[in-house]
Curated annotation (Swiss-Prot):
Protein name listed in UniProt: 3-phosphoshikimate 1-carboxyvinyltransferase
Function: Catalyzes the transfer of the enolpyruvyl moiety of phosphoenolpyruvate (PEP) to the 5-hydroxyl of shikimate-3-phosphate (S3P) to produce enolpyruvyl shikimate-3-phosphate and inorganic phosphate.
UniProt-annotated location(s): Cytoplasm
Listed NCBIfam families: aroA
Gene: aroA
């Protein structure tokens, strides 16, 4: 039997907050200091496109008071229009967050630019990026299939917008907010289903409830003053370690300094309701974000997970792969609906999960907006080849199952975990008793 115990202090800094801290720093007037910035491939892609678009920044590794190495990023900017025409297409690699959110900034710059990515990113839908920016007066061109490259002829004369998000998307909400900061007047973004709210928190935007919807108010052409940011540990990364502890009976793990923003930590409530023994300790607020420690103790069996609420799906969209694999291995069952957004991620995550779970002997059926795991028909006798589909979250979800249960698996691409969790495998090894 495999058992995992220990204290986790080296969880990756939050990916979402790191992206936004860098982009907001580039939009701010003055010097922005970001402590504990993520070293993952996606966040480094954001720094790369900022540098290529004329923003002055530097990063260095520092030794913290507890002996840990932390990454500091310093950004120097003169404000909203500090960007310069790039000499070549801006490479976003595999980072959809970089491409989508930076498009909102480039739409307001008085020059032409082009955003490209790797083969996976170039297949992902970008019409949701173009639609609101075109309504604001920007000229954006996509491929005939509505994907990148995104060719932008920016304009300093963007119009304010009242934009109702057609689907819950923190990336689209953020790109509209970034563009609206440059507009000549006040804009409003309307959410019928909430998504993660880091951009609003970090920019200090006002919001209110109206007719059951959330309205976010973005002032136009208002100076964004530079301020320091601290990046807490990524709850989406913490989910993998939580699952590790819950799958391996007798395990006890404490995960330090995790972002517990209510729009990000809903997976903890789901697991607690299913019988998981999870305790939040040392809870506090830093820079507007709730942070705390998660204690994972494996004392009881988990009930199967049934996830159908669209609002809940929006809050746990990145954690669903791990929750699905955890529920399948722990209880034999899992059911998900209203999650069609999963088909537009780094891979078609619904299909990727079903294909790999079936290889492991689970009886699965997929739908346009989700899938169901009905039980395990057989337990494979030999090593099972798992296809990561070039998707870091698919790779890590099945790696956790293999590590915790001893199920022999062979991952098709282990390097892809570097997108968000470079020290993933080293951390797992350090926790095994």
């Amino acid at each position: 039997m495999r058992v995992f115990k220990g204290e986790v202090t080296a969880l990756p800094p939050d990916k979402s907050i790191s992206h936004r801290a860098a982009l907001i720093g580039a939009l701010s007037e003055g010097t922005t200091e970001i402590m504990n910035f993520s070293g993952g491939f996606d966040n480094q892609s954001t720094l790369g496109v900022l540098k290529d678009a004329g923003i002055t920044l530097r990063q260095e590794l520092l030794e913290g008071a507890d002996g840990r190495t932390v990454r500091q990023v310093i950004i120097e900017s003169k404000g909203l229009w500090s960007f310069q025409p790039p000499s070549a297409p801006l490479m976003c690699n595999n980072s959809g967050s970089t491409m989508r959110m930076f498009a909102g900034i480039l739409a307001a710059q008085p020059f032409a630019s082009e955003l490209i990515g790797d083969s996976s990113l170039m297949k992902r839908p970008m019409k949701r990026v173009a639609d609101p920016l075109r309504q604001m007066g920007a000229d954006l061109q996509l491929s005939p299939s509505g994907t990148a490259p995104i060719c932008i002829k920016g304009s300093k004369e963007l119009k304010p917008i009242n934009y109702r998000l057609p689907v819950p998307s923190a990336q689209v909400k953020s790109l509209v907010a970034f563009a609206a900061l440059h507009a000549d007047g006040e804009s409003r973004i309307i959410e019928s289903v909430r998504s993660r709210d880091h951009t609003e928190v970090m920019l200090g935007l006002d919001s209110f409830e109206q007719d059951g919807e959330r309205v976010i108010v973005v002032p136009g052409r208002k100076t964004v003053a530079a301020k320091p940011f601290y990046i807490p540990a990524d709850p989406s990364a913490a989910c993998f370690i939580v699952a590790l502890g819950l799958l391996a009976r007798g395990s006890e793990i404490i995960i330090r300094d995790v972002c517990l923003n209510p729009t990000r930590a809903a997976f903890l409530n789901i697991l607690t309701d299913a019988g998981a023994c999870l305790t939040i300790e040392n809870q506090r607020v830093i820079g507007g974000e709730t942070i705390g420690d998660i204690l994972v103790e494996n004392h009881a069996a988990l009930e199967p997970l049934l996830i159908t609420d669209p609002q809940l799906v929006a809050f746990i969209i990145d954690e669903i792969p791990m929750l699905a694999v955890l529920s399948a291995f722990a209880s034999g069952r899992f059911e998900l609906h209203n999650a069609a957004e999963l088909r537009t991620k780094e891979s078609d995550r619904i299909d990727a999960l079903v294909v790999n779970l079936q290889r492991l002997g689970f009886d699965c059926e997929q739908y346009p907006d989700g899938f169901v795991v009905k039980g395990r028909r057989i337990t494979p006798s030999g090593t099972v080849v798992i296809d990561s589909f070039d998707d870091h979250r698919i790779a890590m979800s099945f790696a956790i199952a293999g590590k915790a249960t001893g199920c022999p698996i062979d991952l098709s691409d282990i390097d892809v975990v570097g997108v968000s969790f470079p020290n993933f495998f080293d951390l797992l090894d350090s926790l095994q008793v």
